Amino acid sequence: MITVIKWLVSGCCALAAVTTRAPLPKDCRNTPNSRGCWKDGFDILTDYTDPKRAPPGKLVEYNLTVSQQVIAPDGYEKLGMVANGQFPGPTIEADWGDTIRISVYNNFTDNNNGSAIHWHGLRQFENNVQDGVPGVTQCPSKPGETQVYEFRATQYGTSWYHSHFSLQCECPLNGLFGPIVIHGPSSMDWDEDLGPWLLHDWYHDDVFSLLWVGETKNRGAIPESTILNGKGKFDCNHHNDTRCTGTGGEYFEVNFRKGVRYKFTIANTGTLLEYMFWIDGHNLTVIAADFVPIEPYVTDVVNVAMGQRYEIIVEANADFTHGSNFWIYAQYCDEVDLLPHKAVGIVRYDEQDRQDPRTPPLSDQHRDFGCEDPDLDNLVPVVQQSVGRRVNRMEMKDYLRMGQEGYPDPMNFDGDLHKWVLGDVPMFVDWKNPSLKKLAVDEHPDFPPETVPILLDFDTGDWVHFVITNNYTFEKVHFPRNLTPVMHPMHLHGHDFAILAQGRGEFDPSIVPKLDNPPRRDVVNVDTGSYVWIAFQVNNPGAWLLHCHIAFHVSSGLSLQFIEQPKKVKPLMEAAGVLGEFHDRCAKWTEYYDSVNIPDNHTIDDSGI
């Protein structure tokens, strides 16, 4: 057994990442019975939290053309946004340590949309300019323009890419997203990889009409369907709409063989709904949360909030008493009967047996499971890391309080229109003047209040702590008040964060945080009436977004940005040789935007991200 290294905390110093697993042979190879191995000198025990310790890799190149076309994933035709004509878009695939170069051509010539692609969960270490957030890390690319993103895969696991350009392209509302797979070691052995399973809610209506539903009625618009890997079912029998094709779509299907250990990653790429996910008749062994390998734990159901990913192993050992076909389920965690179809796919042990699986009655467990993240005790990182003392303030006035306020008058709670906030004001960005432009040009950058900046001008290795609250029961005490009791999956760009505490009710400052190897991930669900205490190291200069991954909420302003080590940003961009291209894109976008939008009096209808 390897010796556990524990470094003493002195002030705010960073602590070493360690592991208590037995070391692996130096010459081991990645096989079905040794998935913890990878390449010479690199395995599941390697400290991937240090981006500079990634294995040597190769250059992997992809070309994506983003455009509009009619799609019907659930049997109902709508105008959607696709990558290379595919929905979901093609898989971006590489090995841990590879450099990934992706050329994105904006072919939105028919709707005048800009484009910017975010690579969800990838840290972009010392490479903020590649994060793909318009108004924060870049100006959008105009129609007819190609933008080249290039970054190193310093983490491994499965995630996804998606547009971050306003609600017009946001997430799966219109379809512009696809999977990212970074191959690496696993914390448990498996036989066959089934790849990414992208799960999301699907809407038929115009996206901005849906946003107005949430901002005026204080309740998110209900989706028509649930889609798994681009396939779903919608009942056309009760609709005379000619866009309903009559076939009602199709289920996602996968074939199992008895005794085989299958690995896949379930990712919620959705807009509004957090899903309970399970496969009838099978247990799920969870081996990673987001991009963090964890000690395996067994469950029969897992909640997946928007933006979250869980790497799962399923052993094909089902009981055939009631047949050899089994439903794959995804239901909304809060209202189990909200959507007509809970079944989203089929596992078949016999390809020739085309019957639908038996549908057992919904158990009390599946009705009352709730919307909380997995217990923190289950999310134990394989590579351990202890959290140091904070260097920032964490008084009650510093809490990041989620809620709604009146708009345009924030004190008019009884008006028709409301915006979401994470603190004092809803976030709005300027596509022509992103935060990174200020950091790269201005000696003393000035950030408007509506860009919601939080300055992290600390030394490399310092730890910062934040409390995020979603306690709607205190609407008469705290400002802003939350008119809508709903969970919020909070996603941080540029970092994994440690979860030091999570619970219901008002946050108590006397709570003892979990500092010794707490769970780490990049999306945490802050359930209704709850709080979460997170921490991360200051080590990645740039402007990094923290936002709710409910598309309607981020579009309505529920975001902020951390301005991290601002004086180091410009030197990093100069060293990378990207300043010229960065400014050139902004100049082209400004000229294009002014020529197209100002004459027609078009303005940004939402936060811009």
Swiss-Prot record:
UniProt pathway annotation: Secondary metabolite biosynthesis
Lineage: superkingdom: Eukaryota
SUPFAM superfamilies: Cupredoxins (SSF49503)
Record EC number: 1.-.-.-
Domain Plastocyanin-like: 66-186, 196-351, 429-567
Tissue: Specifically expressed in conidia.
Family: Belongs to the multicopper oxidase family.
Its job: Oxidoreductase; part of the gene cluster that mediates the biosynthesis of trypacidin, a mycotoxin with antiprotozoal activity and that plays a role in the infection process. The pathway begins with the synthesis of atrochrysone thioester by the polyketide synthase (PKS) tpcC. The atrochrysone carboxyl ACP thioesterase tpcB then breaks the thioester bond and releases the atrochrysone carboxylic acid from tpcC. The decarboxylase tpcK converts atrochrysone carboxylic acid to atrochrysone which is further reduced into emodin anthrone.
Protein name (Swiss-Prot/TrEMBL): Oxidoreductase tpcJ
Protein species of origin: Aspergillus fumigatus (strain ATCC MYA-4609 / CBS 101355 / FGSC A1100 / Af293)
